[in-house]
Amino acid sequence: MDNMFLIGADPELFIKSIYTNENVSAHDLIPGTKYEPFFVDGGAIQVDGTAAEFNINPSASKSEFLGNMSKVLDNLYERIEGNFDTVLKIDFSPTAIYEPEYFDSLPPEVKILGCEPDFNAYTKEQNLPPST
């Protein structure tokens, strides 16, 4: 029996203002949610907290993986940097810090961090979500 291995990806990225270099929440800039991703060529996009998340279709080869990554990223670039009079840019930093006043103004649901549910591999008990 042949086993076929596929590879995918689901990275998160942040959005910044090109004028102030401050982070901007993706929650009202792109479609899709964790529960209802917005399907695009090569995968899907969705909001994950304040970040923009994308995932790609399972890929059987390096070229298919890179092609799917390019297609979905191109879609995100068009939605973020191609709109809003190009005042926003995609930021691949691993973390984002928001101005306190701006963060306080965001809806409560975009401030929730972590996976639902998240379990401790050793105790098999559910972890408490991190605080913001």
Predicted features and spans:
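Phosphate/nucleotide-binding catalytic core
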Residues: 1-132
